[in-house]
A protein has these predicted regions:
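N-terminal export signals
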Residues: 1-18
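Low-complexity, Gly/Pro
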Residues: 12, 16, 116, 249-253
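Short, glycine- and small/hydrophobic-rich beta-strand elements in well-ordered beta-sheets
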Residues: 14-24, 54-78, 84, 169-198, ...
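Short N-terminal segments immediately surrounding and downstream of signal-peptide cleavage
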Residues: 21-33
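Hydrophobic residues positioned within well-ordered beta-strands of beta-sheet architectures
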Residues: 30-32, 77-79, 122, 148-150, ...
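Surface-exposed interaction/gating patches
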Residues: 35, 127-207, 252
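Residue-level recognition of alpha-helix initiation/capping sites
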Residues: 47-48, 166
């Protein structure tokens, strides 16, 4: 009975924590990765997202939605969806299912047969916004804008929290002042390569991206912060993934 009481108390604490997070304005981000095998699948996905999914998501308060891909390859396609709360993540599929316009315009994609699938697979991660940047930003509307998606893996949960602390304490501010314009920062709650944090940066151009990183690396505040023993990369990071992306013509970010 004592164990049950402890469990109930823990669940109550988690529920209270979730409510506090919702009230604090910290968003959740769903990062979907569509794996495609053919040009027809890419054409179908683009049509579904542009004509059905993005308009429906915007109608129900999930916008702006970002859609990104490699400039040269048809796959993968990344879709970034903003959620105001954890409940919104669970409710989204039911909200869209009750949207007649979405179901009608997305019918071909949603009902794709087994012998002609709409995609190979969908991979998805759920991210929780950092306290240092609780809400998404749209840093650029330039026609030639580019984005960087970066994933920092850590060797343990606590070292992962240390890297998040580093961002919240100062690194996010240093990013902003040196032209590394964040779209979001998120801690992976569900997904692969856990524990990890994931963030996205946006730039007017590839030249702007290169210039900003050069400025960042030379910044005195960054040198001081990264020189602190508790924030040494070899202690708190075990892998970094860097992905350069461009927005689709219908992306809202």
């Amino acid at each position: 009975m004592a164990t049950t009481g402890t469990t109930v108390a823990a669940l109550g604490s988690l529920s209270a924590s979730a409510q506090e997070e919702a009230e604090s304005g910290r968003e959740f981000y769903e990062l979907k990765r569509y794996i495609l095998e053919t040009e027809d699948q890419r054409t179908g996905l683009d049509a579904f997202l542009e004509d059905a999914a993005l308009p429906a998501l915007e109608r129900h308060g999930y916008g702006p939605v970002g859609v990104f891909t490699d400039e040269e390859d048809i796959s993968p396609v990344y879709v970034l969806i903003r959620h105001k709360s954890l409940a919104g993540v669970a409710e989204m599929i039911h909200i869209l299912g009750a949207d007649a316009e979405f179901m009608e315009k997305g019918a071909a994609f949603l009902n794709a047969p087994a012998d002609n699938p709409a995609y190979a697979r969908i991979e998805s991660s759920l991210l929780h916004a950092f306290t240092g940047m609780p809400q998404m930003s749209r840093p650029s509307d330039a026609p030639g804008r580019v984005f960087q998606l970066r994933i920092y893996e850590s060797p343990s949960v606590l070292t992962g929290q240390k890297k998040i602390e580093m961002f919240n304490v100062a690194e996010i501010d240093i990013f902003k002042k040196t032209g590394l314009n964040p779209v979001f920062f998120g801690e992976a709650v569900i997904g692969d390569k856990i524990p990890n944090l994931t963030y996205m940066l946006g730039f007017d151009s590839m030249d702007a991206q290169k210039a900003a990183w050069k400025t960042f690396i030379a910044d005195p505040e960054w040198k001081e912060l990264s020189g602190r023993p508790e924030y040494a990369d070899d202690k708190i990071l075990s892998g970094i993934t860097n992905i350069n992306l461009v927005p689709t013509k219908y992306s809202q970010i």
